[in-house]
Swiss-Prot record:
Residues 241-401 form the Helicase C-terminal domain. PANTHER family: ATP-DEPENDENT RNA HELICASE DBPA, ATP-DEPENDENT RNA HELICASE RHLE-RELATED. ATP binds at residues 70-77. Keywords: ATP-binding, Helicase, Hydrolase, Initiation factor, Nucleotide-binding, Protein biosynthesis, RNA-binding. Transmembrane segments: none annotated. One of its GO terms (cellular component) is cytosol. eIF4F is a multi-subunit complex, the composition of which varies with external and internal environmental conditions. It is composed of at least EIF4A, EIF4E and EIF4G. A motif (DEAD box) lies at residues 178-181. Its EC number is 3.6.4.13. Residues 57-230 form the Helicase ATP-binding domain. It catalyses: ATP + H2O = ADP + phosphate + H(+). This is Probable eukaryotic initiation factor 4A. Residues 1-29 are annotated as: Disordered.
Length: 403
């Protein structure tokens, strides 16, 4: 599918229209957007706004705080990128927008989207820069000295350059927290609150995520002012276009079952999720020995190696990516049509993030869960949480891959 066909599948009726001022606007031309921003939107490949874009962009441009929930693959990054770019004054080469992401890979991907959509707004091709771990701080300081309008980064590095006085926060207009549920979890919460200490009191705050647990919504009261809320009904929290199945299997037979799957059907690209680094390495080694083109990554790898792996997978040079939950959030690879949970995720929210790797932007996709006897209860919890049914894998499942 071409970029021009990017219309997200999330249903109009999936949203809780519980707040005034949230109404779908079915055309980018009808939104309050600069002409040069519209040029960038259409040049990027968007034609018709997705459901979340129809609802979130206009409230974003009005300058108030916003909490927006949208499933993976439904145009969430485009929604906040467009809203953010409309809010900035490109006559001034000052830092005005800050986007925080939980991983280096997601930050790099987000910065690319913002740069491409905003290419006709700025005279500088470098108006949007990334600030992430695994790179030299001195390089970041040089970027800031040269002038940046939008900074996209991970909390640790952004906090560092703020404390050094290199990233001046007084001119900031907008803060976006992408994958907000992860950003406000225990792992990042302290860093996020530390960054907030340096931000202008009147800064616009926008939260975007596929899941918005109640505890996260409760936390937002600490730093948001009467936000517009665009939330998805719980029963809608499963991806259209994704067929979900399970295979009952004993732990020691999972690898053989995996090999059988790859011999049964032709798969464009696939992602296999396992819960430990050791298991990721083991699965990748066994698949490589069977002449599959396999990449693998996990959080303990150097960030430069992880970036190289993602580039290899995106380019199609590698057909299989074996990983931990590191890439479960937001990494956009267009040709993935099957996701295999070699291990079920320990976190129910991560199930949705994982299966969102397949069937993006309305294409068919399949999610297959390997379920041992001890996993049955967790599978039922996932079904109950998302009001969905996960059926046993049928013999003719190749039909679900569009074969």
């Amino acid at each position: 599918m071409s970029q021009q066909d990017r219309v997200a599948p999330q249903d109009q009726d999936s949203f809780l229209d519980d707040q005034p001022g949230v109404r779908p606007i079915p055309s980018f031309d009808d939104m309050p957007l600069h002409q040069n921003l519209l040029r960038g939107i259409y040049s990027y490949g968007f034609e018709k706004p997705s459901s979340i874009q129809q609802r979130a962009i206009a409230p974003f441009t009005r300058g108030g705080d916003i909490i927006a929930q949208a499933q993976s693959g439904t145009g969430k990054t485009g929604a906040f990128s467009i809203g953010l770019l409309q809010r900035l004054d490109f006559r001034h080469n000052l830092i005005q927008g800050l986007v925080l992401s939980p991983t280096r890979e997601l930050a790099l991907q987000t910065a690319e989207v913002i740069s491409r959509i905003g290419e006709f707004l700025s005279n500088s091709a470098k108006f949007c820069e990334t600030f992430v771990g695994g790179t030299r701080v001195q390089d970041d300081l040089r970027k800031l000295q040269a002038g940046v309008v939008v900074a996209v980064g991970t909390p640790g590095r952004v906090s560092d350059v703020i404390k050094r006085g290199a990233l001046r926060t007084e001119s900031l207009r907008v803060l976006v927290l992408d994958e907000a549920d992860e950003m406000l979890s225990q792992g990042f919460a302290d860093q996020i609150y530390e960054i907030f200490r340096f931000l202008p009191k009147d800064i616009q705050v926008a939260l975007f995520s596929a899941t918005m647990p109640e505890e996260v919504l409760e936390l937002t009261k600490k730093f948001m002012r009467d936000p517009v809320r665009i939330l998805v009904k719980r029963e809608s929290l499963t991806l259209e276009g994704i067929k979900q199945f399970f295979i009952a299997v004993e732990e020691e037979h999972k690898l053989d079952t995996l090999m059988d799957l790859y011999e049964t059907v032709s798969i464009a690209q696939s992602v296999i999720f396992a819960n430990t680094r050791r298991k990721v390495d083991w699965i990748a080694e066994k698949l490589n020995q069977s002449n599959h083109t396999v990449s693998s990554m996990h959080a303990e790898m150097p960030k430069s190696d992880r970036e190289r792996v993602m580039n290899t997978f995106r380019s199609g040079s590698s057909r299989v990516l074996v990983t931990t939950d590191l890439v479960a959030r937001g990494i956009d690879v267009h040709h993935v049509n099957i996701v295999i949970n070699f291990d079920l995720p320990t976190n129910k929210e991560n199930y949705l993030h994982r299966i969102g790797r397949g069937g993006r932007y309305g294409r068919k996709g399949v999610a297959i869960n390997f379920v041992t006897e001890k996993d049955v209860e967790l599978l039922h919890e996932i079904e109950g949480h998302y009001h969905t049914q996960i059926d046993e894998l049928p013999v003719d499942f190749a039909a679900y891959l569009g074969e």
